[in-house]
């Protein structure tokens, strides 16, 4: 493939498997990008040979073209903790992982609880970002759980949802009011479901492994008690509730039951919750320390079933970068969190290989579903718009090597793991935001 | 059989032969403590650093006496504060100390798993002198040595561990050690103080002290920490002592040769009544004596490399 810097963004992908679940499309087709515009998707695209010379023509057989992936739950750490990640490095990691939009949580320093911070994030994203950044505002001022943040102003300046993620909204009345008030502005409320009294002091999942290691456990009930409360409040208020990072079988069951009753709830999980079990902590490795904690085999199975039957709508990464200062320390003092932007895609594609999800279901979890939850017209391949899509090889074999990640942080428990499936090119806004193809 | 390990981090990873080897060696070294000149030159020129990130008098003194009786040079660094409070990470502290070329670190830390972490980062041997709620292997070894002295064997013994199992590293190390040596272990205490899914460690669990007393060859009483009441694990120390405190009255139903053990320090009148602690079945001070011998054995095995 030849493409000089001055060349326009002209690509012709031949015989790609195009998967766009929003349009119920899963077919082999040619995909044409002219000057960055996604011009055509159809079985055979013929261009006159003189025109063809201006195109990079890519044999895309056995590869997929999907809408630019959306990660609805990341931590970009800017402003405040730029030594862990910045909007520049986080979005670079995103496009390297195949994502073209990331929703960033408000627990920055300062907290994103007002227009000024939301606008700052969007401004930095415009200047330095490699993909779309979707700021999520706080539920409570300063994440302190005492009074509501200004949702109207947050939405007006570009916030797509509200959450106190990282901290539960412990006060049930505040959560009720948040749901009611967010409904006013048609903002989803994202729940970090954790009963802080039940999880207090906890360092890992409560069970045989925590007993054996002598580490304080966090019972599954800490999550489930809060899921039950928030479902009751969503039912009461009729407001849109989204449960973040679901980790337990009980939570999946309750969300499924609520959905079947018509409660306006959606849910996400993260790859580590359907890939890892808590026995990985046997070596006291702080890379596995995350909140909610990695649970047991029955939970992993329930999460997979929940993904397959649609109870869990989305897969987010909860990309939580930490430096060695926070991670390379005694277990109890180590920060919670796992980075995910550059390791998620192969782990999601593993669900396809093991036949838990169809390719279309898998793509939906990271494209149209998060877009629908956030109420955004994204996550689908739009013709005659600037290309926003991901070209990936679902069988690309490689060993996950976090030393090559674009993220500033290295807290990846999948480092060294052989895996398959990788983004080869990510188009954002009509440009190649990332490419693994040789120039 | 030579002891090939670099570190002693816990009893879960040791096999039966290794445990037997340590206990046999401890028995032979115990004799040194009875001599008028209680010192042998075995570890002359070796350096042992006691690194205690948690207050401890008994264990630290026991390790220190053990090291000195083997002629090692010892240094003690004690701090109640965590490394992070000091501003230097624990790893930095260990790296600095390692640059002074010690042979053995004896490490006590409030956080489970910390000795494992340190062991991966130093070429010196690491002996776990108690980590969080995880393991306290030298304590379990001295407990087993004491049982062996009085019962002649561990295989077939029924050992009841009574009290706050959930927070006890002593209990965990004893469970691993005793189970490997063929003993039956019964945990006894209120449900709030028994760790979740304790049966997965191969033990029986009871919540009724009266029922297990007649079955036990050994009753190991654990210290009840007073803060458990604030953590909503207990309504009061008074109620605990009524149901789970070991008294002479309750011991009337015990086997004739029952051994009463306690890792110390004791809360007299809470988990154990004074007449039991000082009574004819108590081997609590034998445990302390054997502690020096066991720690000499560990230092001998790890310090010679």
Curated annotation (Swiss-Prot), chain A:
Positions of substrate binding: 75-77, 107, 291, 322
Binding site for Zn(2+) 2: 165, 192, 245
Keyword Metal-binding part of the UniProt annotation: yes
Job description of the protein: Catalyzes the reversible cyclization of carbamoyl aspartate to dihydroorotate.
Cofactor binding comment, as recorded: Binds 2 Zn(2+) ions per subunit.
Name the UniProt record assigns to this protein: Dihydroorotase
InterPro entries linked to this entry: Amidohydro-rel, DHOase, DHOase/Allantoinase_Hydrolase, Dihydroorotase_CS, Metal-dep_hydrolase_composite, Metal_Hydrolase
UniProtKB/Swiss-Prot annotation, chain B:
Key words, A-Z: Pyrimidine biosynthesis, Transferase
Pathways per UniProt: Pyrimidine metabolism; UMP biosynthesis via de novo pathway; (S)-dihydroorotate from bicarbonate: step 2/3
Matches recorded under PROSITE patterns: CARBAMOYLTRANSFERASE
Residues that bind L-aspartate: 86, 169, 223
GO terms assigned for molecular function: amino acid binding; aspartate carbamoyltransferase activity
Claim: Oxidoreductase is one of the keywords in the record: no
Coiled-coil regions listed in the entry: none
GO cellular component: cytosol
Similarity section: Belongs to the aspartate/ornithine carbamoyltransferase superfamily. ATCase family.
Subunit description: Heterododecamer (2C3:3R2) of six catalytic PyrB chains organized as two trimers (C3), and six regulatory PyrI chains organized as three dimers (R2).
PANTHER family cross-referenced by the UniProt entry: ASPARTATE CARBAMOYLTRANSFERASE, ORNITHINE CARBAMOYLTRANSFERASE, MITOCHONDRIAL
Protein name: Aspartate carbamoyltransferase catalytic subunit
Gene of this entry: pyrB
